[in-house]
Design a protein with these regions (language model features):
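Short, low-to-moderate order helix/coil transition modules at the start of elongated helical scaffolds
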Residues: 1-209, 216-219
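Conserved beta-strand/loop scaffold segments within soluble protein domains that form the structured core
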Residues: 106, 117, 122-387, 401, ...
Length: 426
């Protein structure tokens, strides 16, 4: 077993001291320490065709500066309706409102949940979802966590309005380790929308692990729009565990400006379970991004769909890996995926790799992929109608992404994405 030296400013004692100061239970303190010991023995996430070994995933202080209140940027982002809203700045809670508390809904920071509902957190924290030993960055998230969210909807409760969260990092040279747990108990329904935001070109790192549990016959709509700045090195690991007859829909906008590694994986463990992953991205500048989207079929009659469209500008590079794995025993399952990449310049690079892995008979599966440069004839036609090249490219980009954006199940995510896409294209 190879061990690497990590440039961390903390050790076992410091991790335990911080956890104890926060009032965490002994099992969580031990989990933090064990994860810290494990991290140097683990490899970075496996990434195709992009070298991430030199990326600054671990340097940066985990002691985040205290900020209070809602900044003008956050005010503009959340608007007037704040009844079901949680906001953290530098990992610290600055606003929380849960109008569904009377129905038993828990919507709070992970730290508060550890104090008030430790048994629930222990049940779901890195047990069935993301594993501590998956890779080095997952282990570091478990060890160094300095932000997080816990959302739990009880059995039979069906929420009619989205629960929303905004997480900002506003400190250069800082490292945010955020961990979210989203649980829809049996026969419940919820919509959860999150936005990760950071500012400035100064170096900082963001490590996010999100675990979504959809119990029997429950339904979750998960929306995420990430707009981390050019200085952010980002690792984002989102995992869904979907039980019998349950449904999970991902609606994701990967709109960071810095180097990014994302993993969105769904485990369809129950019979007749369902997942649908839709994502769009716009890369620009010299950023490098790697997107791994995977659906694992374990339950009979499970259905999984993946649809990703990406646009690359300037000298940006993005790799899209889509995998549908139908395991032995998952008969009558259906796995379908499509990845499409459009490049707007000679220096832009994109790659789409659809993969089908099938270990069962009596199943359906299909994939499609395309990578290509913008059609100059199409641009010429638009420009002949009086548009500038920039305006023509803008229309082409919106048209290319529209088949995904229009199908997103959450209207507010659609609206937010259109705004962000417009900003990145211009």
């Amino acid at each position: 077993m190879m061990t690497v030296e990590l440039n961390l400013a903390v050790n076992r004692e410091a991790v335990a001291e911080r956890a104890t100061r926060l009032g965490e239970p002994s099992w969580m303190v031990a989990k933090r320490q064990d994860a810290l010991d494990l991290a140097p023995t683990l490899a970075l996430p496996k990434v195709e065709k992009i070298k991430i070994e030199g990326w600054n995933f671990t340097e940066g202080t985990t002691e985040l500066e205290t900020v209070t209140g809602l900044s003008s940027d956050i005010e503009a982002l959340i608007g007037e309706n704040r009844d079901h809203m949680l906001v953290t700045r530098n990992g610290q809670l600055v606003h929380a409102q849960n109008s569904e508390a009377s129905n038993g809904v828990i919507f709070t920071t992970l730290e508060d949940a550890l104090k008030q509902h430790p048994e629930l957190v222990e049940k779901y924290f890195m047990t069935e979802g993301v594993q501590v030993n998956e890779d080095r960055l997952a282990a570091l998230n478990a060890a160094l966590r300095n932000g997080g969210t816990f959302l739990y909807v009880p059995k039979g409760v069906k929420l009619s309005v989205p629960m929303q969260a905004i997480y900002t990092l506003e400190q250069s040279g800082a490292a945010l380790y955020h961990h979210a747990i989203i649980v829809a108990d049996v026969d419940s329904e919820l919509t959860y929308i999150e936005n990760f935001v950071s500012y400035g070109d100064e170096a900082h790192s963001v490590n996010v692990v999100t675990e979504v549990f959809v119990e029997d016959n429950a339904k979750v709509l998960f929306g995420g729009v990430d707009t981390l700045s050019k200085g952010a090195i980002t690792y984002m690991n989102r995992r869904g565990v979907v039980k019998q007859g349950a449904k999970l829909e991902w609606a994701l906008g990967h709109m960071n400006d810095g180097h990014t590694v994302t993993e969105t994986k769904t485990h369809l463990v129950g019979n007749d379970s369902f997942s649908d992953t839709k994502a769009v991205t716009v890369g620009r500048g010299e950023q490098k991004q790697n997107f791994n989207v995977r659906t694992d079929h374990f339950g009979k009659g499970s259905e999984g769909f993946i649809l990703i469209h990406g646009v690359q500008k300037d000298a940006a590079t993005s790799i899209f890996n889509g995998t549908s794995m139908i395991h032995h025993g998952a008969s009558k399952s259906n796995g379908v995926q499509t990845e499409r990449v459009l490049m707007l310049s000679e220096k832009a690079r994109g790659d789409a790799n659809p993969i089908l892995l099938i270990d069962e008979d009596d199943v359906m599966a299909g994939h499609a992929a395309s990578v290509g440069r913008v059609d100059e004839l199409q641009l010429y036609y638009l420009m002949s109608r009086g548009l500038s090249r920039k305006e023509a490219e803008r229309l082409v980009v919106h048209g290319f992404l529209q088949p995904v954006v229009s199908e997103l199940a959450i209207d507010s995510v659609k609206e937010r994405l259109v705004q962000v896409i417009e900003g990145k294209v211009n």
